[in-house]
Amino acid sequence: MTDLIRDLILRWRDDPAGTYQSWFLWDERLKNFRSIRRGLQLVVAEIAAGTFGVAYRGSSLETVVHSIAEQRQIFKGADHAFLWKPKLRIPDIYENPANQKAFGQLLDTCLCCNTEEHVVSAIHAIDARKIKGLGPAVANLLYFLHPTIMPPFNTAIVKGYNALTGSKVKLGRWEEYLAMRQGILKLNATYRVLLSNDLGAIGGLLFDLGSGRYTAPP
């Protein structure tokens, strides 16, 4: 019996304009991991010292997120989740000192730890605080710290995952992201020989599906 998902992955890998060749194999991609890690270390240090400030614009976080948003099409618009929305007063990590410290603790834990258990535990801790406007878009920061543990996240990736698996994952909730993450890990294990232990590869496949470049197998 033909494995339609395997055929899709092979076609995607051979597509010069797909995310596998245009982003995942891009030489600059790996260099950006180092600079993003250093940038997040600065964010953590500033929050701990009380010098981060109360605005996104001009902050060390803006610098990091901007460099992520420049990671070609898969991360285009990654900054939207962190932009201050004054009418909604979200994400509530700029004006609320306790929330800002909790956000810094999440990043600090994920910078220092190396295990899936610690990363997921840190996510549960930040989720328990129910900080307005601070959802799984943060996973795009964590991906650059732990690419084998945390898949990237955006609307197109969720759409692609739902199309490929028949799931109904929703945006904006950490528990939904973590459930999708488990499904992504299983998919990645099944097709590991064609993908990578770096979850950016399967994230790119799902992005291309969700953005309409490919149609999910029936």
For each feature predicted by the language model, list its residue ranges.
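Conserved beta-strand->loop/alpha-helix structural units within folded catalytic cores of enzymes
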Residues: 138-141
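An N-terminal alpha-helical hairpin/helix-loop-helix interaction module that forms a charged
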Residues: 1-131, 147-218
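Small-residue hinge/turn detector
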Residues: 134-135
